[in-house]
C-alpha cells in the first residue's frame, strides 16, 4: 500500500510502502485486514503548504488484496517535536478490483 500526499502548491510526498516506512503494529500484525486499525509513523520533509489531497494505492498483491478503508489521518512532521500539517480524509470505499469503484 502506498500513499501520495499533495499540497495546494503542487508539491507531493510519496510513501511507497506504508508498512516498511513506519508500521507500528508489530511484526505479527496483519495489516489492511477487516476490523483492524493500522497505525504508521515515520519522518519526512514537510510540504510547502498543508496537505489538501491524497492518493492511497494498493499494488494488488496477496491472496485477498481487497481492502476497505474508512479514513486516512495524516500528520506531517519533520521531527518528533514539530508538526507541519494535520488532515483527516474520509475514504469509505474499497481498494479492490472486485468491488466498486474497481480501482486499486
Swiss-Prot record:
PROSITE patterns: PLAT. Pfam families: PLAT. Signal peptide: none annotated. InterPro entries: PLAT/LH2_dom (IPR001024), PLAT/LH2_dom_sf (IPR036392). Residues 1-104 form the PLAT domain. It comes from the Eukaryota. This is PLAT domain-containing protein 3. It comes from Arabidopsis thaliana.
